[in-house]
């Protein structure tokens, strides 16, 4: 390393190899493992475990993803109803235990999934006596009712009941006053004269929380593990909610990447990754780069294992037959390989590649 003066009075540090702007992100540890775990229906409630992350990144990413999931994902909701023989929400219904205000409140909690972005009109026709739930609506073409056990109303004997339920897609929370004003102005031409607007909560995510735990790579334990707990209404799965939120953030942050130099470095990296190797470039790294104990390193060296590509093709039985190599060393190697999404017993076609030494240097430098 040397110290240089650029002529303007400022002093900079010069290193042996040229610094690339892509080093800002390439030199950071990226998550190598994302697991979806939970009890019961993973399409509605699950935990996503992401590791390893650089220290502090779990808090940064967890906060950003939680905020986007709770505020910016689009979903589906009821925005209005029409009940046969009813002109406004203060009307009482003969033979129905609930009044119209109760119906509006109950139906505002109806959760559906539309297969298109167009609004739809669902129909509910029932005859008493008995409790009427969302199951009476049934699934229509292009729409699925998700909470069919939702209580809607209770009918008396021989009471005929008919209503329309208006659903559409949207984002966040829209108060009934907005849809009421839209219907009066004629902006919502599909509704009838007896339209009664409801408050619409579109967010498909019911609850998000995250916690931060310690993670490790080899002997180093100063990494983060991010555990995100997500509960949805069933119109989107928890892992999809996280993925979409990440895509929203990616799209918004893209505007900040205005530097041509940054764009150029990103493009070169993508081009290289797209055209390079038929297998994980980690296989080209030497086992000397792994954070292993001295005993494990010596065992690999004595067994003439130079590259990670050589190592992963060994089975656990092969490794345990190596002199002085025990179960503790095996667990250590399994853990390090798992952090790179690799494992023992892999089959690597066409290994080793030609000019492996040059390829190894190239990817080590990058």
Curated annotation (Swiss-Prot):
Keywords: DNA-directed RNA polymerase, Nucleotidyltransferase, Transcription, Transferase
UniProt keyword Transferase, yes or no: yes
Positions of region (Alpha N-terminal domain (alpha-NTD)): 1-260
Disulfide bonds: none
Enzyme Commission code: 2.7.7.6
Record-level Gene Ontology MF annotations: DNA binding; DNA-directed RNA polymerase activity; protein dimerization activity
Keyword Electron transport included in the entry's annotation: no
One Pfam family of this chain: RNA_pol_A_bac
Catalytic activity line of the entry: RNA(n) + a ribonucleoside 5'-triphosphate = RNA(n+1) + diphosphate
InterPro entries, sorted: DNA-dir_RNA_pol_insert (IPR011262), DNA-dir_RNA_pol_RpoA/D/Rpb3 (IPR011263), DNA-dir_RpoA (IPR011773), RBP11-like (IPR036603), RNAP_asu_C (IPR011260), RNApol_insert_sf (IPR036643)
Start and end residues of each stretch annotated as Alpha C-terminal domain (alpha-CTD): 274-366
GO biological process: DNA-templated transcription
Gene Ontology cellular component list: cytoplasm; DNA-directed RNA polymerase complex
Family label: Belongs to the RNA polymerase alpha chain family.
Subunit comment: Homodimer. The RNAP catalytic core consists of 2 alpha, 1 beta, 1 beta' and 1 omega subunit. When a sigma factor is associated with the core the holoenzyme is formed, which can initiate transcription.
Domain notes: The N-terminal domain is essential for RNAP assembly and basal transcription, whereas the C-terminal domain is involved in interaction with transcriptional regulators and with upstream promoter elements.
Alphabetized NCBIfam families for the sequence: PRK05182.1-2, PRK05182.2-5, rpoA
Protein function: DNA-dependent RNA polymerase catalyzes the transcription of DNA into RNA using the four ribonucleoside triphosphates as substrates.
Cited HAMAP family: RNApol_bact_RpoA (MF_00059)
The protein's name: DNA-directed RNA polymerase subunit alpha
Gene: rpoA
């Amino acid at each position: 390393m040397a110290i240089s003066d650029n002529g303007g009075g400022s002093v900079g540090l010069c290193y042996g190899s040229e610094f690339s702007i892509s080093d800002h992100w390439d030199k950071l540890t990226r998550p190598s493992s994302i697991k979806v775990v939970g009890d019961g229906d993973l399409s509605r409630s699950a935990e996503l475990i992401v590791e390893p992350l650089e220290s502090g990144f779990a808090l940064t990413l967890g906060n950003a993803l939680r905020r986007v999931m709770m505020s910016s994902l689009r979903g589906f909701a009821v925005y209005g109803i029409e009940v046969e023989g009813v002109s406004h929400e203060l009307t009482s219904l003969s033979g129905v235990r609930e009044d119209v205000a109760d119906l509006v409140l109950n139906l505002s909690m109806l959760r559906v999934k539309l297969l298109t972005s167009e609004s739809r009109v669902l129909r509910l026709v029932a005859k008493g006596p008995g409790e009427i739930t969302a199951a009476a609506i049934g699934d229509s073409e292009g729409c699925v009712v998700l909470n069919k056990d939702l209580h809607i109303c209770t009918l008396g004997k021989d009471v005929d009941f008919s209503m329309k339920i208006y659903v559409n897609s949207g984002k966040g929370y829209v108060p009934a006053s907005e849809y009421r004003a839209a219907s009066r102005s004629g902006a919502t031409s599909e509704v009838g004269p007896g339209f009664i607007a409801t408050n619409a909560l579109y967010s498909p995510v019911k609850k998000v929380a995250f916690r931060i735990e310690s993670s490790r790579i080899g002997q180093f334990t100063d990494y983060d593990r991010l555990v995100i707990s997500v509960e949805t209404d069933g119109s989107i799965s928890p892992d999809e909610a996280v993925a979409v939120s990440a895509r929203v953030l990616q799209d918004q942050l893209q505007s900040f990447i205005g530097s041509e130099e940054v764009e150029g470095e990103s493009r070169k990296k993508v081009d290289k990754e797209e055209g390079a190797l038929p297998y994980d470039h980690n296989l080209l790294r030497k086992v000397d780069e792994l954070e292993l104990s001295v005993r494990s390193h010596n065992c690999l060296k004595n067994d003439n294992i130079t590259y990670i590509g050589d190592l992963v093709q060994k089975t656990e039985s092969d490794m345990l037959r190596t002199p002085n190599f025990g179960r503790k060393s095996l667990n250590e190697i399994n853990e390090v390989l798992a952090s790179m999404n690799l494992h023992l017993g892999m089959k690597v076609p066409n290994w080793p590649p030609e000019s492996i030494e040059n390829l190894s240097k190239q990817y080590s430098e990058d």
